[in-house]
């Protein structure tokens, strides 16, 4: 196992969800546990500036992980998630598990999760889960054109379109009927949101594909969302480009992906048959 943080001069940053007093309490407990191994600072995730550390411990839920990723902005620093939220698909460790396994955590090789580069006009963002165009305002059907490698593919009619990473395949895309894709696969997933048709199905594209989404008309207000952290209006005549990032999100995992699927999402269980 290739340890990337071992040494006496390790700089650790513990970030916590400022909306949760429990997360703040756990963050301080984590800081004390890390003290023998690293120079440690603690910061509310919404108040942190540019992250300059060798490892980040994110205390909260999956939203805290996503905020941390946006603060990193493509800088490849290992992130450990300590869960005090409800689901915690990315925040795999409990506080007790993290503290009890600190030697293993400090020598673990992080998983390299594919990210997306999402650009609109002159702005760009990195995404761990997804970038998507979604209708806002009155309940009208949104019409969104899909281009792949500058070639027109189709026009989606519905509530929007999600472009997800394999990590994001268990997030919003899953709720919209998209496939579950293991994180080691390098692909882009295109999932329509509530399509007003019986024929549109999710697409799985190669990592090299460049996706472009644009409103087909101006009758419906449409917004761009990036990991739930960015909310930007997209007008007719504008477009959003999404491609695989050159950077990876480094996530320290506690257990096998399929174990997480079963324990967090109760995936793959048998029906509860009654007695014969």
Question: Where are the predicted features?
Answer:
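ATP/NTP phosphate-donor binding region
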Residues: 3-55, 59, 67, 71, ...
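Short glycine/serine/threonine-rich phosphate/pyrophosphate-binding segments
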Residues: 63-69, 170-175
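ATP/nucleoside-binding phosphotransfer catalytic cores, i.e., glycine-rich phosphate-binding loops
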Residues: 125, 133, 138, 149-152, ...
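Short beta-strand/turn micro-motifs composed of small residues
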Residues: 16, 60, 83, 215
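Catalytic core of DAGKc-family lipid kinases
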Residues: 87-160
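Proline-centered loop/turn at the N-terminus of a beta-strand
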Residues: 76-78
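Gly/Ser/Thr-rich active-site loops/lids in small-molecule metabolic enzymes
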Residues: 155-159, 163-199
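A residue-level signal for conserved active-site and pocket-lining positions in enzyme catalytic cores
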Residues: 57, 83, 131, 228
